[in-house]
Amino acid sequence: RRHFRLGMSDYGAWVVLPALLRQQQALAPGVSFGIVQEPRLETARQVAEGQLDCALGVFPLLPEGVRARRLFEERFVCVCRRSLFDRPDGLSLDRYLAARHVRVSLQDNPAEEVDSALEKRGLRRQVALTLPHFTVAPALLAGTDLVLTIAERILERLRLPEELAVCEPPLAIPRFDYVQIWRGDAEREAAGAWLREQIQAAARKI
């Protein structure tokens, strides 16, 4: 029997964890998992210090000795009431910037991919709400004129209210790699290697 501590947000728990649990039930029913959610830098620090067996997420900066492996590529989409569309396929940049936004971020000082893409063009969005819950955010849009820009896979098993629609962002936001990270000096440990392979296998089924 083995207990693994994994770092991930509710995005990872929603997108990757179901397939991982199905594999674990079939291959290693004695294995258990504990999920920890922290900001990116804190998660990476806990991996580096051995407090977490591995972590899933987006990690632009990694401590020395921490290794990463790509699970899949992800992209952003927008979600809002269909009545906000000012063109047939979604939002113009002017409408997007005039709207108020929901921002999902685990960081104490949010500065994530969407805001970075805007800042590179000298633009800013109006953020009405910042919260750390990917799976909750889409449901908060109903009955409001708020716009959410979110990683696409989070929407695959969510049932959106009829008034909401998904469209492409009106500006180029780079795709990003969703990865798993682990402590390099534990790389040859059999249990950890097994865990990482199971996570890779689960990601291939998404």
Residue spans for each PLM region:
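C-terminal effector-binding regulatory domain of bacterial HTH transcription factors
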Residues: 26-30, 138, 143, 151-165, ...
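Hydrophobic hinge/microswitch elements
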Residues: 39-44, 48-52, 57-58, 107-165
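Short, well-ordered beta-strand segments
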Residues: 3-7, 55, 79, 102, ...
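Central regulatory/effector-binding core of bacterial HTH transcription factors
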Residues: 1-63, 131
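Ligand-binding "clamshell"
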Residues: 62-75, 145, 158-168
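Short Pro/Gly-enriched coil loops immediately N-terminal to beta-strands
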Residues: 67-81, 93-98, 169-177
